[in-house]
């Protein structure tokens, strides 16, 4: 506030004091009250009734039909000199109008203060309506915030004209002086409302009604519409004030030493271009005030919906640091120090969904050449290069043309080819992050609702560039997938089918710049033209096994989308892909005389027959009816040759396992499980492949050898979650075998044939509950443990140990070595012998009476499932879903709860009952130490491949899987926590050692297992 006094000529000794405020001191946000919209036309021309029926499109624009149609007002603040938007738009909320007019009476507050605007700043009012779910401008109004006549801030009520789109003054008509277009009566009435005239109640009651009547007669009708608004009124006039800055001069270095106490630097603010910026105190002549032309750019960054807070200093630093022309030559020779290398390694192991900080992005950018030059895929010791490319792509600014050109014209073409791309990185590039419609969203749009012709050309060019670069990345990922063999591709097929959703969002969606979309390379209007869809269909047509699972995966997703139309995303993508696959498969088989298409039709027929059989059983019997009757009915039905299940019309591959040819079933070995859903156990008749050297004589024709394949068919449960877990277990098994570590896992086959049905392989087994409750013969119980045995009697009589002794005589032949199906690096020579990690010494269990082969299977499988179920957070573990096969392999079943979810209270992080340890010989036996060593090797091996596993879960976030949809935002975080990536390898091993000790000594899980067994007993 300031006070000026000046002498008058008539009274020389008298002074008049004028009190006013300065705009630079007014630290208050600009606020506007939107009152109402006045229509000066008595008869508004509306569309006649006949036109409504002739042209239904008129209904899209409600202002042509209703006099008081729904409208909303959007307010922006502009800098008058350059007409730059300097605030976030604000708009009125929805208001239902009546027949009296369009009245809002809503107070709006903008996110810019009065002391941040210049004297030429003005408000733009965009009156909009909704047409085809998008805002469309009805009219615009302008009001300058300062009056140039008096350099004062406008306040009080104002009546401003509304310019329609066909008005010649529509583009811009801003009055900086006295507002014209108002009658003398209107001016006086506004002055009265603004408080310039005293209010007398007795006089107002007499005069105001007559003024209103006169006002209606003499109202200005130069415009069809007028908008009435109110600005805040202040106690004093607000006069515009700014600071004139002097050109800085260069001072000697010796004179620029700081003479300011540290505390003083925090106590002063100076104003640069009417915006407060904390700086050092200005009384020191050695510190100069410099205008930053980029400051207004940072002020507008908050309009980015993906941004939270912005620091102008950080943004300026990033811009200067990434100046391509200045530091490219220097960056090529940069090498990180040991401390920086450790920091970069920590950044590289971050999951794909983790947000990188500005410092981390700058660090990745700084050493981009170092990582790109050392990205040789055949160097196993170079761990830091792993996952660098996706992290680098996440660290660049996609809105910066320099960074984009540098990345896609120099870094990727010269340093990154398909051979050097990790398979996990390729999967990450196919995720939802690399989408041009999110990466290419402009930082802000300058009044994009005004008209189509006023869109910025730079936004269009930038989006086209981002679109083409994203398409290039996705093609690069597909090219990497082409290097994988069909068996390896099958490990990721479930996630690749999910990735088709993200392809659809890119290739099906119309680009925002439709009129020039022809500039976009390879722009496809259909998902069928996406590189990933083309690749998967092509490989599925050529390889029958891959095509088998591709068909069922796509079929299930298609049915799920049709049954859940509320799910976001295009609903026809899987239907189109499925039809295209069948069409190409049929043509390919006809041209090459292959039976793949005929086999697929037989598989569909087989699933339909099983479905009708289950429905027939449910219709014929009640839920609580005896299971024996259902079994008898099932066997009679299967034995009836008229039902075509005893002997199929033609052999065909089993959908659950295409390597198995089935030709019929064994009715006497089929059954119905005791359950309300009545799942079937069908023992199929298989045709075994003939081995070389066992060919029969051709004199009597070909003779086939038959085998058995038991499976379960279930309707009523969604098996996709179990299918995902088994797929991850199978992948982990291959990763371990790739390191020469075969843990004898049992990833049994499971296939969802619809969202509510599926097939499950039936593996011979017994539950631990039944094994521990059995009584074994004395010959088995004391067959082991001679005089030299140190095993306690309680351990020697363990049910699991007795079970292994019982089956030791049956399993004397050692299984062949199982190799990984994962392809080695393409750059590695085939003659080079891979370096394998040192393995624990073989288990010797002669003192326990168990075959070394069975005990080896048991110890390894226990270690494998112990680690895997911990990483996946498998819950609801009890002795009924912990299984043991006659070959000694321990395994888990029923994955209804994963990612840490569990129906029981206080679930353990790892399910490792003490009875399982006793089956090895107890806590003090050598087998227990071997078990722990296998656990440690398994855990460290999977930690090294955590990026691949996390990327697979990342692609499943939009899948309709219960435990993923329960909290999709924390799925990756939950899995990542189990890997303990922030720890060193030694710390991780110690962490897992503590987990094993806690699980073995836990008391609560033992109690819960007893209660569960008791509950199962009473249910039986």
UniProtKB/Swiss-Prot annotation:
Phenotype caused by lack of the gene: Leads to defective acidification of the vacuoles and a lack of growth at pH 8.0. Vacuoles are considerably enlarged and electron-transparent. Shows aberrant patch-like accumulation of vesicles, which are localized in the periplasm close to the plasma membrane. Shows a staining of punctuate structures, possibly multivesicular bodies (MVB), that are scattered all over the cell, the result of a late block in endocytic vesicle transport. Results in significantly lower carboxypeptidase Y activity. Causes disturbance of normal nuclear migration. Also leads to avirulence in mice.
InterPro entries (alphabetical): ARM-type_fold, C2_domain_sf, Kinase-like_dom_sf, PI3/4_kinase_cat_dom, PI3/4_kinase_cat_sf, PI3/4_kinase_CS, PI3K-type_C2_dom, PI3K_accessory_dom
Region (Activation loop): 892-913
Name listed for the protein in its UniProt record: Phosphatidylinositol 3-kinase VPS34
Gene induction: Expression is increased up to 12-fold during exponential growth, followed by a decline upon entry into stationary phase.
Function, as annotated: Multifunctional phosphatidylinositol 3-kinase involved in acidification of vacuoles, pH-dependent cell growth, and autophagocytosis. Plays an important role in protein transport and virulence. Component of the autophagy-specific VPS34 PI3-kinase complex I essential to recruit the ATG8-phosphatidylinositol conjugate and the ATG12-ATG5 conjugate to the pre-autophagosomal structure. Also involved in endosome-to-Golgi retrograde transport as part of the VPS34 PI3-kinase complex II.
Segments forming domain PI3K/PI4K catalytic: 666-1004
The organism's place on the tree of life at top rank: Eukaryota
PTM comment text: Autophosphorylated.
Subunit structure: Component of the autophagy-specific VPS34 PI3-kinase complex I composed of at least VPS15, VPS30, VPS34, and of the VPS34 PI3-kinase complex II composed of VPS15, VPS30, VPS34 and VPS38. Interacts with VMNA7.
Organism, scientific name: Candida albicans (strain SC5314 / ATCC MYA-2876)
Domain C2 PI3K-type residue range list: 49-210
GO cellular component, one term: endosome membrane
Catalytic activity field: a 1,2-diacyl-sn-glycero-3-phospho-(1D-myo-inositol) + ATP = a 1,2-diacyl-sn-glycero-3-phospho-(1D-myo-inositol-3-phosphate) + ADP + H(+)
Principal location listed in the UniProt entry: Golgi
Enzyme Commission no: 2.7.1.137
Family: Belongs to the PI3/PI4-kinase family.
């Amino acid at each position: 506030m300031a006070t000026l006094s000046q002498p008058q000529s008539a009274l020389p000794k008298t002074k008049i004091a004028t009190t006013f405020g300065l705009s630079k001191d007014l630290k208050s946000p600009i606020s506007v009250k939107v009152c109402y919209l006045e229509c000066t036309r008595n008869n508004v021309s509306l569309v006649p009734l006949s036109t409504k029926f002739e042209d239904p499109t008129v209904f899209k624009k409600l202002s042509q039909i209703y006099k008081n149609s729904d409208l909303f007002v959007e307010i922006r603040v502009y800098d008058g000199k350059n007409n730059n938007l300097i605030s976030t738009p604000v708009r009125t909320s929805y208001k239902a109008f009546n027949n009296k007019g369009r009245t809002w009476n809503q107070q709006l507050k903008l996110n810019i203060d009065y002391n941040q605007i210049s004297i030429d700043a003005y408000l733009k009012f965009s009156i909009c309506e909704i047409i085809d779910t998008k805002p469309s401008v009805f009219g615009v109004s302008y009001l300058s915030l300062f009056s140039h006549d008096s350099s004062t801030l406008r306040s009080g009520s104002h009546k401003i004209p509304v310019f329609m789109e066909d008005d010649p003054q529509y583009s811009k008509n801003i009055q900086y002086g006295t507002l014209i277009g108002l009658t003398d009566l209107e001016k006086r009435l506004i002055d009265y409302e603004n408080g310039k005239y005293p209010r007398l109640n007795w006089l107002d009651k007499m005069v105001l009604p007559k003024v209103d009547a006169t006002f209606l007669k003499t109202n200005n009708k130069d415009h069809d519409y007028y908008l009435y608004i109110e600005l805040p009124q202040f106690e004093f006039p607000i006069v515009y004030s700014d600071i004139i800055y002097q050109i800085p001069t260069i001072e000697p270095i010796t004179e620029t030493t700081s003479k300011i106490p540290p505390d003083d630097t925090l106590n002063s603010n100076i104003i640069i271009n009417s915006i407060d910026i904390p700086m050092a105190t200005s009384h020191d002549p050695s510190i100069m005030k410099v205008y930053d032309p980029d400051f207004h750019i940072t002020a507008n960054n908050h309009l980015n919906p993906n941004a939270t807070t912005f620091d102008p200093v950080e943004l300026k630093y990033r811009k200067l640091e990434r100046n391509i022309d200045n530091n490219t030559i220097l960056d090529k020779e940069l090498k990180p120090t040991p401390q920086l290398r450790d920091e970069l390694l920590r950044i590289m192991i971050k999951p794909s969904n983790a947000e990188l900080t500005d410092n981390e992005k700058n660090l990745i950018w700084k050493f981009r050449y170092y990582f790109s030059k050392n990205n040789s895929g055949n160097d196993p010791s170079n761990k830091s290069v792993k996952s660098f490319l996706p992290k680098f792509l996440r660290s660049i600014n996609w809105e910066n043309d320099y960074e984009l050109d540098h990345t896609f014209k120099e870094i990727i073409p010269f340093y990154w080819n398909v051979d050097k791309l990790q398979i996990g990185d390729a999967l990450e590039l196919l995720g939802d992050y690399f989408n041009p419609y999110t990466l290419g969203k402009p930082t802000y749009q300058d009044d994009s609702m005004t008209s189509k012709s006023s869109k910025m050309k730079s936004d269009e060019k930038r989006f086209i560039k981002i679109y083409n670069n994203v398409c290039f990345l996705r093609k690069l990922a597909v090219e990497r997938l082409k290097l994988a063999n069909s068996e390896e591709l099958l490990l990721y097929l479930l996630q690749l089918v999910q990735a088709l959703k993200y392809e659809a969002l890119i290739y099906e969606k119309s680009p925002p710049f439709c009129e020039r979309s022809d500039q976009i390379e390879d722009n496809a209007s259909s998902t069928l033209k996406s590189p990933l869809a083309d690749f998967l269909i092509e490989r599925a047509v050529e390889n029958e096994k891959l095509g088998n699972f591709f068909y069922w995966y796509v079929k299930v997703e298609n049915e799920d989308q049709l049954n859940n139309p509320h799910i976001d995303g295009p609903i026809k993508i899987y239907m189109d892909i499925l039809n295209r696959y069948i069409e190409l498969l049929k043509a390919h088989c006809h041209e090459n005389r292959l039976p793949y298409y005929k086999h697929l039709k037989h598989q569909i027929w087989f699933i339909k027959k099983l479905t009708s059989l289950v429905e027939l059983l449910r219709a014929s019997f009640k839920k609580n009816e005896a299971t024996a009757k259902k079994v008898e009915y099932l066997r009679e039905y299967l034995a009836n040759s008229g039902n075509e299940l005893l002997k199929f019309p033609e052999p065909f591959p089993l959908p659950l396992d295409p390597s198995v040819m089935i030709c019929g079933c064994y009715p006497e070995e089929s059954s119905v499980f005791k359950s309300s859903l009545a799942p079937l156990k069908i023992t199929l008749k298989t045709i075994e492949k003939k081995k070389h050297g066992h060919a029969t004589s051709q004199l009597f024709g070909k003779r086939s050898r038959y085998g058995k394949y038991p499976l379960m068919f279930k309707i009523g449960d969604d098996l996709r979650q179990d299918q995902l877990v088994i797929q991850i277990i199978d992948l982990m098994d291959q990763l371990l075998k790739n390191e020469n570590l075969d843990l004898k896992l049992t990833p049994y086959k499971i296939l969802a044939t619809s969202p509510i049905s599926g097939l499950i392989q039936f593996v011979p087994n017994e539950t631990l509950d039944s094994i521990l409750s059995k009584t074994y013969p004395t010959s088995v119980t004391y067959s082991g443990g001679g005089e030299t045995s140190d095993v306690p009697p309680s351990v020697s009589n363990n049910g699991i140990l007795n079970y292994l002794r019982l089956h030791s005589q049956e399993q004397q032949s050692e299984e062949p070595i199982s190799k990984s199906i994962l392809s080695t690096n393409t750059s590695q020579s085939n003659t080079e012998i891979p370096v394998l990690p040192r393995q624990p010494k073989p288990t010797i269990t002669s003192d326990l009476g168990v075959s070394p082969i069975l005990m080896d299977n048991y110890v390894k499988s226990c270690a494998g499932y112990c680690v895997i179920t911990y990483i996946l957070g498998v819950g609801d573990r009890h002795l009924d879903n912990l299984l043991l096969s006659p070959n000694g392999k321990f395994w888990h079943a029923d994955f209804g709860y994963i990612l840490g979810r569990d129906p029981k209270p206080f679930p353990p992080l790892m399910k490792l009952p003490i009875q399982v340890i006793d089956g090895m010989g107890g806590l003090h036996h050598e087998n227990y130490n071997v078990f722990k060593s296998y656990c440690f090797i398994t855990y460290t091996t999977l930690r090294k491949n955590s990026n691949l596993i996390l990327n697979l879960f990342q692609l499943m976030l939009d899948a309709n899987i219960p435990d993923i949809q329960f909290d999709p935002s924390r799925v990756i975080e939950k899995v990542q926590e189990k890997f303990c990536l922030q720890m060193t390898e030694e710390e991780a091993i110690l962490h897992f050692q503590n987990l094993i000790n806690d699980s073995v000594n836990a008391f609560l899980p033992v109690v819960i297992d007893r209660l569960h067994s008791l509950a199962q007993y009473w249910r039986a």
